[in-house]
Amino acid sequence: MSELCPCGSILNYHECCGPYILGTQVAAKPAILMRSRYCAYVEKNVDYLIATWHPDCHAQEWRESIIQGFTKTVWHGLTVIAETPGRHPDEAFVEFISRFTDADNAQITAMHERSRFLRIKEHWYYIDGIRPSLGRNDTCLCGSGKKHKKCCGR
């Protein structure tokens, strides 16, 4: 039986993010890398996450804290909003919303981020991201339909 990819595409995992995580394909675009990194979080694949962080981040130093985070987090979905070019051809941004629950809070929480990616020798790497601010009266990103201040913004 085939399994849909956790990244939210309508493709089978082995036709979508699986080849990137297995290392048989290289993500040609930052949004593809973003989706495959989300799948790596779902699958608890610390090696892929570390390999796709920009080398300047020294992500291998965070290995244990990444693994500890896996035990507390359950992922519920990813929405890629936009992929935009950066200031030069080897920089790009991906804006997304991911939904999750953690051990400390059973309510689904949404994380909104604009991630920055840099390309080195045809490989894209995640380097950092910013979280756009959300007004207290804006609709919460988690999909509850409630205002942010009455939901995840508490």
Curated annotation (Swiss-Prot):
Record's signal peptide: none
Residue spans crossing the bilayer: none
UniProt name for this protein: UPF0225 protein YPTB2098
InterPro entries assigned: NTF2-like_dom_sf, SEC_C_motif, UPF0225, YchJ-like_M
Domain of life: Bacteria
SUPFAM superfamilies: NTF2-like, Sec-C motif
Family listed: Belongs to the UPF0225 family.
Disulfide bonds: none
Organism expressing this protein natively: Yersinia pseudotuberculosis serotype I (strain IP32953)
